[in-house]
């Protein structure tokens, strides 16, 4: 089993910025699916993780009800990681969010989450096929 575990140095990392119990469910599912996941409990923590961690492959945001300006957070993080894919989880699309950021409705299935993540992490998808 250890041989199939990806190297943390080369594996794209996922940073999740969320403030509620959804964070635990999403983090758990992604970790059980073999992803390297780092939790950020608020926008400042997400900024810090994205500054400090190498090889970030995806940012997942759910800032509903926090007062966080999600589009500004995405733009700020993309100053350092200009091509970073982002997945927004929420009840609806957010005005001003960059056009390339899809929204996954909060009432999603585990399969919908994994398909969304796989679609945004093409390097991992390619590695799975090899």
Predicted regions and their residues:
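A structural signal for isolated positions on well-ordered beta-strands in alpha/beta enzyme cores
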Residues: 15, 38, 85-87
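Conserved phosphotransfer microenvironments
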Residues: 56, 60-80
